[in-house]
Amino acid sequence: MRLLVLAALLTVGAGQAGLNSRALWQFNGMIKCKIPSSEPLLDFNNYGCYCGLGGSGTPVDDLDRCCQTHDNCYKQAKKLDSCKVLVDNPYTNNYSYSCSNNEITCSSENNACEAFICNCDRNAAICFSKVPYNKEHKNLDKKNC
């Protein structure tokens, strides 16, 4: 019985850890829209204390603060009535957006949850584009957080 409960928790955790490839690719696409020369999944994953899975401690710089704000935005989204756990949550929900001339527009056809999540990702991508990238903070040992 304990193994069954553990398996269920791991399945839920995997879904909430951002493993939905389409949702991840949407955020990736927004970052590429604002920073065309970037490789978002390589550049920003495991940067500082907040960029990537999880996050804790004190952000190490402005870019890390962008990630902390993004994490907090997702936490707010999960509290919305329109964002149901496991159905419409920030880590698994897909939304519609467009990119033109390095400008991101979230579609007016998104439902309330999709619109909120789209704007979380949009604001993070804009934030990333406005702050410096410090290579010393990539793969930072989390004990420094």
Curated annotation (Swiss-Prot):
Its EC number is 3.1.1.4. GO terms for cellular component: cell surface; extracellular space. One of its GO terms (biological process) is positive regulation of podocyte apoptotic process. It is found in: Secreted. PANTHER family: PHOSPHOLIPASE A2, PHOSPHOLIPASE A2 FAMILY MEMBER. Belongs to the phospholipase A2 family. This is Phospholipase A2. The gene is PLA2G1B.
